[in-house]
């Protein structure tokens, strides 16, 4: 059994309009939500072998607050920033088969699209700091439409 998680970055700040989109940090609420969701995830006692992440400032800060000082190995890839569904899948397909648990930390619409594609479950919305937990019996490079099961989908507002 393989575990796959999709985490959308937490809410970003628009306080400084001179910043490029890539460089926007988390807002106060984003920091609180990343901490909250990280605590929820820790309560599940799930193990992550590797994180595949966009290198944007808000995804880096989301990972820092979500995991604290216990983040697993992170592989940053530019293709996850403004990613298409295919970009996300290509990153997952490249994961070594001995890895059993992967988290992708990125942006919408790709986090939403990947979750719906792999599970064939409709999600009304994938909010900032939303977390989807999937399970599959497939090899990483054999993931395809409907090949994963949605274990849970948690939103920060459900924990506030």
Q: What do the predicted segments below correspond to?
A:
Residues 80-96:
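Short phosphate-binding loop-to-helix
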Residues 62-66, 88, 114-115:
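Hydrophobic packing residues within well-ordered alpha-helices of enzyme cores
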Residues 95-98, 103, 108-129:
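Non-DNA-binding regulatory cores of transcription-related proteins
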Residues 2-3, 7-79, 83, 123-127, ...:
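Active-site-proximal alpha-helix that buttresses catalytic centers in soluble enzyme cores
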Residues 40, 65-69, 94, 117, ...:
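Active-site catalytic microenvironments for nucleophilic, acid-base chemistry
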Residues 93-105, 146-156:
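A polyampholytic, Gly/Pro-enriched intrinsically disordered region
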Residues 122-153:
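Domain-level recognition of soluble alpha/beta enzyme cores
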């Amino acid at each position: 059994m393989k575990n796959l998680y999709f985490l959308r970055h937490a809410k970003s700040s628009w306080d400084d309009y001179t910043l490029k989109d890539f460089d926007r940090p988390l807002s106060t609420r984003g920091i609180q939500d990343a901490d909250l969701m990280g605590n929820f995830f820790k309560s599940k006692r799930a193990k992550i072998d590797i994180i595949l992440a966009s290198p944007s400032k808000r995804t880096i800060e989301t990972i820092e607050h979500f995991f604290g000082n216990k983040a697993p190995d992170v592989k940053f890839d530019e293709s996850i920033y403004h990613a298409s569904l295919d970009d996300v899948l290509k990153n997952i397909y490249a994961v070594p088969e001995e890895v059993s648990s992967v988290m992708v930390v990125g942006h919408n619409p790709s986090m939403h699209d990947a979750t719906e594609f792999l599970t064939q479950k409709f999600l009304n919305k994938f909010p900032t700091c939303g977390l989807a937990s999937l399970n599959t019996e497939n090899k990483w490079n054999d993931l395809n439409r409907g090949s994963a099961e949605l274990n849970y989908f948690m939103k920060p507002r459900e924990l506030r």
